[in-house]
């Protein structure tokens, strides 16, 4: 087992973007607490949580910024995108409009961060397959067109949520600064050796 006590702790800011009620908060809640709240409550403004991940070769601290999808909060979002390491753009597979709007969200990220950001396109609510309006193939195609990473999840069922964060962890750059590790909210993960997902860092600009 790796000795994590000597590993540096690097903080990475992840901002979650997307239309209202696509499941941004639910994905974060599933990752943080392995739970799901059936009672919908819209995020007001911006929420913040953080979690330590012990990886195979390093320890990182993920700062998770949950943004509101409502139009009245849109003016707040660019300032949170500006210093982010990762943008997680979420849509609801049962809502075609939320999928179409992801192009705008990705554009917003690139306008603020250029190519210096990892972007992940996430199709959520795969547990509602009988109501699906957006195929997996359409999601994969859009991700290729936008040159971003892609995954489908179900925050309700817990499907692929840990895998989402593994993909992100694999794509993140190496440790460059040392800090004292924080102990609360720890999750241990061994990302796959296959690091091809890191192509999400590339940008056609």
From Swiss-Prot:
Transmembrane segments: none annotated. GTP binds at residues 18-25, 43, 66-70, 124-127. InterPro entries: P-loop_NTPase (IPR027417), Rab (IPR050227), Small_GTP-bd (IPR005225), Small_GTPase (IPR001806). GO terms for cellular component: cortical granule; cytoplasm; cytosol; dendrite; endomembrane system; Golgi apparatus; Golgi cisterna; perikaryon. Disruption phenotype: Sterile with fertilized embryos failing to develop in the gonad. This may be due to cytokinesis defects in embryos and increased permeability of the embryonic surface to exogenous small molecules. Furthermore, the exocytosis of cortical granules following fertilization is delayed and only partially occurs. Another study suggested that sterility may be due to abnormalities in the hermaphrodite sperm. Lowers rate of spontaneous reversals in locomotion. It is found in: Cell membrane; Cell projection, Dendrite; Perikaryon; Golgi apparatus. GO terms for biological process: cortical granule exocytosis; cuticle development; intra-Golgi vesicle-mediated transport; intracellular protein transport; retrograde transport, endosome to Golgi; retrograde vesicle-mediated transport, Golgi to endoplasmic reticulum. GO terms for molecular function: GTP binding; GTPase activity. Highly expressed in body wall muscle, intestine, somatic gonad, distal tip cells, vulva, and neurons including AVB, AVD, RIG, and PVC (at protein level). Not expressed in AVA and RMDV neurons. Changing residue 25 to N: Constitutively inactive (GDP-locked form). Diffusely localized. Fails to localize to the cortical granules in oocytes. Does not recruit sep-1 to cortical granules in embryos following fertilization. The small GTPases Rab are key regulators of intracellular membrane trafficking, from the formation of transport vesicles to their fusion with membranes. Rabs cycle between an inactive GDP-bound form and an active GTP-bound form that is able to recruit to membranes different set of downstream effectors directly responsible for vesicle formation, movement, tethering and fusion. In its active GTP-bound form, acts redundantly with rab-6.2 (in its active GTP-bound form) to positively regulate the retrograde trafficking of cargo molecules from endosomes to Golgi structures. This is Ras-related protein rab-6.1. The gene is rab-6.1.
